[in-house]
């Protein structure tokens, strides 16, 4: 019996997800379902969830890369919320995007105002150089 077309019969074809077709790790189908369920618009185009999944995947990869660098700088092999906080707050664009976001257990950025630091006197510096 002929399948009516070229290639394999419809029962033999291997199905592939929209995420794999787009080369993404984030779930395109789930994002599409959530967009429809959220009543953001009456209709959701087929390209919208692919684009949104790509943007979310890029942001996640960017934050995780910076957080991994922060963890490595602190000689740790596990990313904790503190590393996420340091990564986001030290990056200008991510800090602007997530400026109003509070990261639980993230702590604060270390900063001491210049006025609060001890004053270095020139007399002590000269005395130490002469000895």
From Swiss-Prot:
Biological role: Core component of nucleosome which plays a central role in DNA double strand break (DSB) repair. Nucleosomes wrap and compact DNA into chromatin, limiting DNA accessibility to the cellular machineries which require DNA as a template. Histones thereby play a central role in transcription regulation, DNA repair, DNA replication and chromosomal stability. DNA accessibility is regulated via a complex set of post-translational modifications of histones, also called histone code, and nucleosome remodeling.
Taxonomic path: Eukaryota, Fungi, Dikarya, Basidiomycota, Agaricomycotina
Residue numbers carrying Phosphoserine: 128
UniProt family annotation: Belongs to the histone H2A family.
Protein name: Histone H2A
Biased composition (Low complexity): 8-23
CDD domains cross-referenced by the UniProt entry: HFD_H2A (cd00074)
Record PTM N6-acetyllysine, positions in chain: 6, 8
Domain of life according to the entry: Eukaryota
SMART domains registered for this protein in UniProt: H2A
Subunit structure and binding partners: The nucleosome is a histone octamer containing two molecules each of H2A, H2B, H3 and H4 assembled in one H3-H4 heterotetramer and two H2A-H2B heterodimers. The octamer wraps approximately 147 bp of DNA.
Residue ranges of the region described as Disordered: 1-24
Motif [ST]-Q motif, residue range(s) on this chain: 128-129
Any one GO CC term of the record: nucleus
GO molecular function: DNA binding; protein heterodimerization activity; structural constituent of chromatin
Domain notes: The [ST]-Q motif constitutes a recognition sequence for kinases from the PI3/PI4-kinase family.
Main location: nucleus
Protein's GO biological process: DNA repair; heterochromatin formation
